Amino acid sequence: MLILTRRPGESLYLGDNIRITILGMQGKQVKIGLDVPGDMVVYREEVYRRVMEENRMALETSNADLLAATQIWHDRTKE
């Protein structure tokens, strides 16, 4: 992990098109601004983890549905 020190109003770049600016600090919180390309999605970590978990659960459900449909089709072809 790269660790950097920045003051309010200072920025850093990730590549050529992502700028992160420190806007201010209040107690234990740091307010940051992100300038990112319009086609890039940005999530807070807790939201990202929830989305990933829901996607995983949806995939498991989809697999179960597919297996059930396959079994029904298989049973009908035996008749």
Curated annotation (Swiss-Prot):
Disulfide bonds: none annotated. It is found in: Cytoplasm. InterPro entries: CsrA, CsrA_sf. Its main location: cytoplasm. GO terms for molecular function: mRNA 5'-UTR binding. Keywords: Bacterial flagellum biogenesis, Cytoplasm, Repressor, RNA-binding, Translation regulation. GO terms for cellular component: cytosol. It comes from the Bacteria. Pfam families: CsrA. One of its GO terms (biological process) is regulation of carbohydrate metabolic process. Homodimer; the beta-strands of each monomer intercalate to form a hydrophobic core, while the alpha-helices form wings that extend away from the core. PANTHER family: CARBON STORAGE REGULATOR (PTHR34984:SF1). NCBIfam families: csrA, PRK01712.1. Belongs to the CsrA/RsmA family. A translational regulator that binds mRNA to regulate translation initiation and/or mRNA stability. Usually binds in the 5'-UTR at or near the Shine-Dalgarno sequence preventing ribosome-binding, thus repressing translation. Its main target seems to be the major flagellin gene, while its function is anatagonized by FliW. This is Translational regulator CsrA. It comes from Nitratidesulfovibrio vulgaris (strain DSM 19637 / Miyazaki F).
